[in-house]
Amino acid sequence: MSLNIETKKVAVEEISAAIANAQTLVVAEYRGISVSSMTELRANARKEGVYLRVLKNTLARRAVQGTSFAELADQMVGPLVYAASEDAVAAAKVLHQFAKKDDKIVVKAGSYNGEVMNAAQVAELASIPSREELLSKLLFVMQAPVSGFARGLAALAEKKAGEEAA
């Protein structure tokens, strides 16, 4: 499908805007994937707040020029789907988890903090809990001593009330 120059410029601007605030950009090959699988992948990405797009590699290379993802341009070969997210692990997690279900999605590379990652490093990044999960775990750890102290005080109050009644 041939795109005219204005359509290409609009696409590059849209992609540049989408990745401007992204911490992570992950690319995966999608050769031979069914429409229903791609629709499911897009739905998963939307749910996790991941910008997911299939586009020409030349347009993607232009969009990443001058960004922290510029080093990833060498990896942009073949039919690729691009996933970008503000959450450092969301894009990697969405593509990695979907690749486990559908072998037609193959994670090729990614970029985080200006560093290019291979597929194994993207898988490692995907295994890290999200920011929300880490915050909830931290909150639980911080609440545990306080709630234990409160339960101890309540038990002591019950014991004192039981002794006074007897």
UniProtKB/Swiss-Prot annotation:
GO cellular component: cytosolic large ribosomal subunit
GO process annotations (BP): translation
Keyword field: Ribonucleoprotein, Ribosomal protein, RNA-binding, rRNA-binding
Example GO molecular function: structural constituent of ribosome
NCBIfam families listed in its UniProt record: PRK00099.1-1
Subunit note: Part of the ribosomal stalk of the 50S ribosomal subunit. The N-terminus interacts with L11 and the large rRNA to form the base of the stalk. The C-terminus forms an elongated spine to which L12 dimers bind in a sequential fashion forming a multimeric L10(L12)X complex.
Main function: Forms part of the ribosomal stalk, playing a central role in the interaction of the ribosome with GTP-bound translation factors.
Family stated for the protein in its record: Belongs to the universal ribosomal protein uL10 family.
Record's protein name: Large ribosomal subunit protein uL10
Organism listed in the record: Neisseria meningitidis serogroup B (strain ATCC BAA-335 / MC58)
Lineage: Bacteria, Pseudomonadati, Pseudomonadota, Betaproteobacteria, Neisseriales
